[in-house]
Amino acid sequence: METKLTLGNKGSLSLLALSGVVASLFYWSHVVAGRILWPSYNPLAQPVSDLTANSAVSQGLASRILYGYDFFNLLFCFVLLVFFRRVTRINRTFYAGLVLKAVAEVLSTIGYKLFPLADTEWTSSFQNNMHYAITGVIVLCYIVLSLLLAIGLAKTKKHPAMSRFLALFSLVFITSGLLTVLVANFQPQYAGLVERINLYSLMVSNIVLSLWMFTGAKDIGLKDA
């Protein structure tokens, strides 16, 4: 079901949809900058969050760059909600996934600012335990929302390519998320690598969703289901 908007408003939303691409670029930039400042950082073993831990040499610059990611990422979540409510409605299942994504990202932005890792040794302190708890909730949200997005879009049978991508994203994200826990406990020397597959799959999904809105704003209208 289409909600009437002016062409200018639709164009503005399509342009703002690119905030998902910008957010992902900021995210990767904070990783690159952090590694430059921390030459001994081991990306195969260490998680990305080590780069912004309070005790990390890279904390200052990496955290400042991450503010750019936070801003554009939250903007992207807002655009997703508006676009698929006022411009194009898919169905309730798909939209529920978008709402859960927004909730997860707000929790991530606020939670990680309040409780960054205290150190890179992952000691059992209150601050670190809160960081782990927030991570657990966010990962659970993303497991559920990835399934909601994939199932919701697949139900329409209108966008097979995008449906396949979301199904693949769900598989990669859920599998790599579970493997991260297992590898961290049994093969910690590869924990950082597996975690990156998980996090970078999320960044790729944001870029694809962003470009999908940007290029498909005029031809992805569907009946509300």
Question: Over which residues does each language-model region extend?
Answer:
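Short, Lys/Arg-rich, polar N-terminal cytosolic tail immediately upstream
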Residues: 1-13
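Internal transmembrane alpha-helix with an interfacial aromatic "cap," most often the third helix
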Residues: 67-98, 144-156, 216
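Hydrophobic alpha-helical transmembrane segments of integral membrane proteins
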Residues: 92-124, 178-191
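Interfacial segments of alpha-helical transmembrane regions
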Residues: 13-21, 87-103, 160-169
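Interfacial helix-start motif at the membrane-water boundary
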Residues: 51-71
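Membrane-proximal helix-loop-helix units in multi-pass membrane proteins
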Residues: 107-151
